[in-house]
């Protein structure tokens, strides 16, 4: 699968997550707290909170950490985070969307801008690249839960728009407002998904050469290393050879 799926595989290459586990847990805890504050602290009634808890479990975040993050929201503890979207261009003109949660807008903007500049990219105005992407709901399952035909049939019945299946798994996409209902229907059929999220899906994926691809990957790593950054979405794809090298 091209686009964000391939990129996620790069960003979670062997050893990287382990090296920054505390940072990963911190970002997951922040999303859980924000989701619980914006909705209700019950994941059965709050699709965003459920998705955040699912992501935390996928990273083996301890149950105590998850419960503590929810209590911060219900007890009125912790900072009040503002959700901000940044858009920009990387080497080769590739488009990037950055989602952040911050208690200091100026600090976060400075950090993100610095990462773009150091990598030869540029931070742009809001709306500069988002028109190249679609905001969609994503529900992902391991390949073993069903064959491609069964997943397609179930996804259509659940109200999804598209399904992509290969040896790495199944990705079901839907209108962003329908994510909760689609995810619930598919979970009843196939069990808990490995990921449920709102994502920015590129309308077209740009193939880049290995030199440019490596620069872009480094750029996204620099951005993701910022504590306030939650997600990075891109519209480029790299060669299998480069992906293999970067995963070593």
UniProtKB/Swiss-Prot annotation:
The keyword Transcription regulation applies. Its main location: cytoplasm. It is found in: Cytoplasm. Keywords: Cytoplasm, DNA-binding, Transcription, Transcription regulation. GO terms for molecular function: DNA binding. The keyword Transmembrane does not apply. GO terms for cellular component: cytosol. GO terms for biological process: regulation of DNA-templated transcription. InterPro entries: Integrase-like_N, TACO1_YebC-like_2nd/3rd_dom, TACO1_YebC_N, Transcrip_reg_TACO1-like, Transcrip_reg_TACO1-like_dom3, YebC-like. Belongs to the TACO1 family. PANTHER family: TRANSCRIPTIONAL REGULATORY PROTEIN YEBC-RELATED, TRANSLATIONAL ACTIVATOR OF CYTOCHROME C OXIDASE 1. This is Probable transcriptional regulatory protein M446_6579. It comes from Methylobacterium sp. (strain 4-46). The lineage of its organism: Bacteria, Pseudomonadati, Pseudomonadota, Alphaproteobacteria, Hyphomicrobiales.
């Amino acid at each position: 699968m091209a686009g964000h799926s391939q990129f996620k595989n790069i960003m979670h290459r062997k050893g990287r997550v382990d090296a920054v586990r505390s940072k990963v847990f911190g970002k997951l805890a922040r999303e859980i707290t924000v989701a619980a504050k914006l909705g209700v602290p019950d994941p059965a009634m709050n699709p965003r909170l459920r998705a955040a808890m699912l992501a935390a479990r996928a990273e083996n975040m301890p149950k105590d950490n998850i419960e503590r993050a929810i209590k911060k929201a219900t007890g009125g503890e912790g900072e009040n985070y503002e959700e901000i979207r940044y858009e920009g261009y990387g080497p080769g003109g590739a488009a990037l969307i950055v989602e952040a949660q911050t208690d200091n807008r100026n600090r976060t903007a400075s950090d993100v801008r610095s990462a773009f500049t150091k990598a030869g990219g540029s931070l742009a105005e809001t709306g500069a690249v988002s028109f190249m992407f679609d905001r969609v709901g994503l529900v992902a399952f391991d390949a073993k839960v069903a064959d491609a035909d069964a997943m397609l049939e179930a996804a259509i019945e659940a109200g999804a728009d598209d399904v992509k299946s290969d040896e790495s798994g199944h990705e079901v996409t839907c209108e962003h407002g329908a994510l909760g209902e689609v995810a619930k229907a598919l979970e009843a059929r196939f069990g808990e998904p490995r990921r449920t999220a709102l994502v920015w899906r590129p309308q077209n994926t740009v193939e880049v050469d290995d030199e440019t691809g490596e620069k872009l990957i480094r750029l996204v790593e620099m951005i993701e290393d910022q504590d306030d950054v939650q997600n990075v979405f891109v519209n480029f794809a790299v060669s299998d050879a480069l992906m293999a090298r970067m995963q070593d």
